[in-house]
A protein has these predicted regions:
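Membrane-proximal basic amphipathic "stem/tether" segments
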Residues: 1, 128-149
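N-terminal anchoring/stem segment of glycosyltransferases
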Residues: 1-70, 163
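Flexible glycine/proline-enriched surface loops and loop-helix/loop-strand junctions
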Residues: 12-13, 152-154, 173
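Active-site rim elements
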Residues: 16, 76-78, 143-147, 158, ...
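Short secondary-structure transition/capping segments
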Residues: 53-55, 75-76, 111-115
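An acidic/histidine-cluster motif and surrounding catalytic segment
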Residues: 68-78
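GT-A fold catalytic core of metal-dependent nucleotide-sugar glycosyltransferases
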Residues: 80-133, 150-153, 158-161
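Catalytic core and acceptor-binding pocket of nucleotide-sugar-dependent glycosyltransferases
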Residues: 165-173
Length: 173
């Protein structure tokens, strides 16, 4: 079972990747905490943010300072986002729970999904899909209306996992 623990990752570089903690980040934390009432909402950071919105978010969070990894499996991690990717996976591997990117606004509780071992989102993009393909997809996928979106892969902006989930363990191998 996925524990009701939320994880957020931010501040893997001193300049925050040019994006200081903002209203959107605060709303991400606030909506997740209010809707899901987690046992803990853990904020993983190397460099602690500052500012008005950070001061509002801080009381909702348990702070966990981490050292951003420089490499994985002998390969250097050159981008801040890749360092954050590893931190989020390690956090879920260690305690399980829910990881949300800080631009994700919660609109419903996620507790009904906690019986799964692992959940990852699907990345979609608007695309032109020919009418005959849409009709086939509608029939095969049980859509109630025709969609004009296409999958571009998996998205790690929202992850739910049991502690030591097989999927994350394999991902980190």
């Amino acid at each position: 079972m996925i524990p009701n623990i939320f994880h957020f990752v931010f501040g893997m570089a001193p300049d925050f990747g040019g994006k200081p903690f903002s209203l959107v980040h605060y709303l991400s934390v606030k909506s997740a905490v209010e809707l899901n009432q987690p046992e803990a909402a853990i904020f993983h950071y190397q460099y602690e943010p500052t500012g008005e919105w950070w001061e509002k978010a801080k009381p909702l969070l348990t702070l966990k300072q981490v050292k951003a990894p420089e490499s994985i499996m002998g390969n250097p991690l050159l981008h801040v986002a890749h360092k954050a990717d590893i931190i989020r996976l390690q956090a879920l591997q260690e305690t399980g729970g829910v990881y949300l990117d800080l631009d994700t606004i919660s609109v419903r509780p996620l507790t009904s999904l906690y019986h799964h071992e692992f959940i990852i989102g699907q990345e979609l993009k608007a695309a032109f899909v020919p009418r005959n393909w849409r009709q086939k997809l509608k029939k095969q996928l049980g859509w109630t209306k025709e969609n004009s979106v296409a999958s571009t892969g998996l998205c790690n902006a929202v992850l739910l996992a049991q502690k030591n989930s097989r999927f994350i363990n394999r991902w980190l191998e």
